[in-house]
Amino acid sequence: MSQPNSILMSYGWDPSIYLEEPKLLEGLKPGRVLAVYGEYSKIIIEQGEKKGIFSGALMASGESIVTGDWVLIREIEGDELCIVEKILPRKTFLRRSNPGKRKGSQAIASNIDLLLVIMGLDNDYSPRRIERYLFLAKVSGAQVTIVLNKKDLCMDPENKFMEIKMIAGETPIEMISALDLKQTRTILQWIDPGKTIAFLGSSGAGKSTIINSLLGGEIQKTNEVKVSDGTGKHTTTRRELFLLPSGGVLMDNPGIREVGLFSEGSEDELEEVFPEIAVAAEECRFNDCSHNEEPNCGVVAAVKDGRISEARYFSYLKLSKELMAYQALNDPEEARKKKQKDKQMSKALQKRLKDKGRK
């Protein structure tokens, strides 16, 4: 079992998991997935790094392993290879929907304590994308902080800061220039020893500069690997965990500009990103109001009298429609409900137009 100041505890291992996983006493050892290279994974255990491959049973289960996972492995004596026998329960799970019209979601990482949403104040700036990232973070279960980068390249950084603050609500926001080491190091206040942080942001937002600054070196250049087998230089489309000199664990991950939304349940997480719409929705006549064409809609009324901005309203409608499309694609029953609701909305609109023509 890992002791204080052990390698695994520096990567965030919680010894209480032993109480929940009796299989740890059956010749298996805990480890954390540092990176995934196709059918192989780099795993850290108390004795050092191993190259993990799936057991037959785990492969047959259809489960996939992602960077950040805690796993149980069986060592192979005298070999750097180990067998991954079990994936331990994930406390947080970062995903996005598959690109295009493919079903399901795409795993990004697991067991993230804090997501840092990085956005540049240059051409990368997009309040609407911040809303998508916030939704992704809400669904994952991780805490979130927004970092606005490149303030040195922005003519009106304070105005943009206030615009994002209106969107972010109580979510903490930092505004920095990644080229200023002192400013970049302010991020360390959010990182506790043993906690794992990951970055969300598009390519060009300045994540690499921030990561290299926090790690004290250009890890982007020295750790490029082949996705197929983990050797040689080939691509940067990988996610990998690194220990921070100041304590804590950092996940280096590729830029993500296109963030397809998904939800396994209701629109509760979306309403957390749009709290003003959730408040106005309490005044709606119908419990299942879509806040679009239904009569006596509290949200539409709030837009008309200026309590909700049109930009936020139309963004909410777009994301809500995207969620419904995802649910319909992955659930035939949801597809039937969506078709029925679209039909009802169409009839309601026709009636409103007809009534308007009579006046």
From Swiss-Prot:
Report any one BP term from Gene Ontology. ribosomal small subunit biogenesis
Q: Known EC number(s)?
A: 3.6.1.-
Q: Which SUPFAM superfamilies match?
A: P-loop containing nucleoside triphosphate hydrolases
Question: Which cellular compartments is it found in?
Answer: Cytoplasm
**Uppermost EC category:** hydrolase
* Residues of the CP-type G domain: 101-259
The UniProt annotation places Zn(2+) binding at C284, C289, H291, C297
The record, for InterPro entries, names: G_CP_dom, P-loop_NTPase, Ribosome_biogen_GTPase_RsgA, RsgA_GTPase_dom
Q: Where does GTP bind?
A: N149, K150, K151, D152, G201, S202, S203, G204, A205, G206, K207, S208, T209
Regions of biased composition (Basic residues) lie at 349-359
Single GO cellular component annotation?
cytoplasm
Cofactor-binding details, from the entry: Binds 1 zinc ion per subunit.
Q: Does the keyword Oxidoreductase apply?
A: no
What Gene Ontology terms describe what this protein does at the molecular function level? GTP binding; GTPase activity; metal ion binding; rRNA binding
- Kindly state which keywords UniProt assigns to this record, in alphabetical order: Cytoplasm, GTP-binding, Hydrolase, Metal-binding, Nucleotide-binding, Ribosome biogenesis, RNA-binding, rRNA-binding, Zinc
Disordered, as annotated region: 331-359
Which cofactor is essential here?
Zn(2+)
Q: How does it assemble?
A: Monomer. Associates with 30S ribosomal subunit, binds 16S rRNA.
Physiological role: One of several proteins that assist in the late maturation steps of the functional core of the 30S ribosomal subunit. Helps release RbfA from mature subunits. May play a role in the assembly of ribosomal proteins into the subunit. Circularly permuted GTPase that catalyzes slow GTP hydrolysis, GTPase activity is stimulated by the 30S ribosomal subunit.
| Protein family according to the UniProt entry | Belongs to the TRAFAC class YlqF/YawG GTPase family. RsgA subfamily.
NCBIfam families hit by this protein: ribosome small subunit-dependent GTPase A
What is this protein's record name?
Answer: Small ribosomal subunit biogenesis GTPase RsgA
Q: Source gene?
A: rsgA
